[in-house]
C-alpha cells in the first residue's frame, strides 16, 4: 500500500509566476497560434498549475523537498474548498482551450491527463467527498502526526518552521470540525464503528505529553548546524507548543468526534449508503482504474481472481497432505515457526529481504532509483489500525529516503510468511523503485512525475 502522510488541499489563488502572460491571453488567441506557441502555452500553464498545487498544498511541497511553504498547513476550511472549485474550473477551461492538433503524442498526453485530473477534482468536490475529513486510515488527525517523519530538520529555520506549524494546529482542527459538521448536515458520514476507532487514535496522540509526544521526535536528535542556544530555545518552545497548542487541539477534536460526530456515523459500512453512494462508487472505480468498467464488472473480476488464486492455493495445500485450504491455513496459524518472535524480528526480516533483492535489480532494470529506502516501525499511536506495511515516498533529490513503515504490534500473532512478498511490494522492485524513478524522469512535467493512478501503482508493485 502506497500512502502519502499529508493533507493535500486545494487553493484560493493560483501562482502568478510562470504563466502570467498565458493567463492574460484570450483562449481563442492560444487556440489559433502555431504549434510551437501552443506547446509553449501548454507548458507554461502546466507550470502555473504546478506552482498552484505546491503553494496550496504545503505539506505536499515539504514532502517533495520544496520548503517555500514549510511553515504552514493547508487551508482546510469550507470557504477555501469552495474557492478552489472555482479555481479548478478556471484551470480546466484554460487547458481545454488549447488546440493540441499537431502536438507530439507526449504533449497531447500531458494536456489530456491534466484535463482528466482537473475533472476528477471537480467531481470529487461535487460529490462532497471533502466533507468526510476524519477516518481511521488517513484522517487529518493521523496525517498531521504521521507527517512529522517527512519534515526536514537540518537547520534552525526548519525547526522554527515546525514550531510555527505546531502553533497553527488549533486553527487547522477548528477548520476540520467545521467541515465535519457540514458533512453531518449533508449525511456524508463515515461508518460509526470506524469513527469510534478515530476517538481512540486521537486519544493516543493527545495523551503523551512533552518529550513523550510524537511531535517531540525532532527534539531528540538536533543536527550540529543548530547552535546550542537555539537548541535550548527550540526545545523549550516546541514542548510548550505541544502541551499548550497541539494537545489541547487534539483533545477538542477528540471530544467533538466522541460526543457529536461518531454518534451520527452511518450504520451501513458500504459507500452505497451515502447520498449519491452509487455515483460515488462509480467515480471511485473510474478514478482508481482509469477505465470505464462498472463497479459490477470490477467486482465480478475480483471474484473471478479470488476463485482462481484459491484454486491454486488449494492444489498446493493438497500436495502437502492437507484435505483442503482451510485445514492448511489452520496449521500455519497454529505453527509457532510461522510467527514473529519480537518486534525487531519483523523489522530485520524486512531489511534482510530488501538487502537480498538489491543486487538482483541490475539484472532486471536498466534504470535504478538513486534514493535509498529504509524500514521503520509504525508509530505506536496508529499500530492498532495500520496495515501490515506501507510506503512513504522520499524526496526526488534523495535527501530523504523512501520509508517502509512496518506494523510490529502484536508481533506474536503476526505471520512471517508474507513478509518477503510484502517487502518486495512496498520496497524494491515495488513502490520504492517505481515511484523513485517516476519522480525523477526528466521529460515529464512534475504533475506526471507525481501522478498516483492506483491501478497502475498497485499493479506494478
Model regions and ranges:
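Gram-negative bacterial Sec-dependent N-terminal signal peptides
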Residues: 1-23
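N-terminal maturation segment of proteins
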Residues: 24-460
Amino acid at each position: 500500500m502506497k500512502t502519502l502522510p499529508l493533507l493535500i488541499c486545494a487553493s484560493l489563488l493560483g501562482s502568478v509566476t510562470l504563466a502570467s502572460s498565458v493567463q492574460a491571453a484570450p483562449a481563442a488567441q492560444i487556440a489559433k497560434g502555431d504549434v510551437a506557441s501552443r506547446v509553449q502555452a501548454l507548458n507554461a500553464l502546466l507550470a502555473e498549475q504546478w506552482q498552484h498545487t505546491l503553494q496550496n498544498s504545503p505539506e505536499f511541497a515539504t514532502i517533495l523537498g520544496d520548503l517555500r511553504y514549510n511553515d504552514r498547513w493547508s487551508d482546510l476550511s469550507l470557504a477555501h474548498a469552495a474557492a478552489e472549485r472555482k479555481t479548478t474550473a478556471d484551470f480546466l477551461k484554460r487547458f481545454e482551450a488549447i488546440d493540441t492538433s499537431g502536438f507530439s503524442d507526449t504533449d497531447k498526453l500531458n494536456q489530456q491527463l491534466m484535463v482528466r485530473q482537473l475533472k476528477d477534482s471537480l467531481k470529487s468536490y461535487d460529490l462532497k467527498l471533502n466533507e468526510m475529513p476524519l477516518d481511521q486510515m488517513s484522517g487529518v488527525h493521523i496525517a498531521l502526526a504521521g507527517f512529522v517523519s517527512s519534515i526536514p530538520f537540518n537547520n534552525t529555520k526548519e525547526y522554527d518552521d515546525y514550531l510555527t506549524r505546531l502553533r497553527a494546529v488549533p486553527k487547522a482542527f477548528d477548520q476540520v470540525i467545521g467541515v465535519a459538521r457540514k458533512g453531518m448536515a449533508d449525511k456524508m458520514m463515515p461508518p460509526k464503528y470506524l469513527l469510534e476507532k478515530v476517538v481512540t487514535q486521537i486519544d493516543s496522540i493527545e495523551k503523551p505529553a512533552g518529550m513523550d509526544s510524537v511531535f517531540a521526535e525532532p527534539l531528540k536528535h538536533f543536527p550540529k548546524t543548530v547552535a546550542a542556544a537555539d537548541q535550548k530555545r527550540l526545545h523549550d518552545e516546541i514542548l510548550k507548543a505541544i502541551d499548550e497548542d497541539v494537545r489541547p487541539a487534539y483533545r477538542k477534536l477528540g471530544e467533538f468526534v466522541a460526543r457529536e460526530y461518531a454518534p451520527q456515523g452511518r450504520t451501513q459500512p458500504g459507500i452505497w449508503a451515502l447520498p449519491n453512494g452509487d455515483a460515488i462508487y462509480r467515480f471511485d472505480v473510474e478514478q482508481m482504474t482509469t477505465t470505464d468498467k462498472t463497479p459490477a464488472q470490477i467486482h465480478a473480476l475480483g471474484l473471478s481472481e479470488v476463485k482462481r488464486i484459491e484454486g491454486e492455493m488449494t492444489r498446493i495445500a493438497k500436495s502437502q497432505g492437507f484435505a483442503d485450504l482451510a485445514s492448511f491455513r489452520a496449521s500455519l496459524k497454529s505453527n509457532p515457526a510461522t510467527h514473529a518472535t519480537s518486534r525487531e524480528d519483523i523489522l530485520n526480516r524486512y531489511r534482510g529481504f530488501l538487502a537480498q533483492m538489491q543486487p538482483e535489480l541490475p539484472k532486471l532494470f536498466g534504470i535504478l532509483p538513486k534514493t535509498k529506502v529504509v524500514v521503520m516501525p509504525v508509530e505506536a499511536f496508529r499500530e492498532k489500525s495500520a496495515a501490515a506495511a506501507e510506503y512513504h515516498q522520499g524526496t526526488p533529490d534523495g535527501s530523504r529516503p523512501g520509508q517502509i513503515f512496518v506494523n510490529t504490534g502484536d508481533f506474536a500473532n503476526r505471520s512471517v510468511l508474507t513478509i518477503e512478498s510484502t517487502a518486495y511490494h512496498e520496497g524494491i522492485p515495488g513502490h520504492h523503485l517505481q515511484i523513485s524513478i517516476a519522480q525523477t524522469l526528466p521529460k515529464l512535467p512534475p504533475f506526471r512525475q507525481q501522478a498516483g493512478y492506483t491501478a497502475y501503482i498497485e499493479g506494478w508493485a
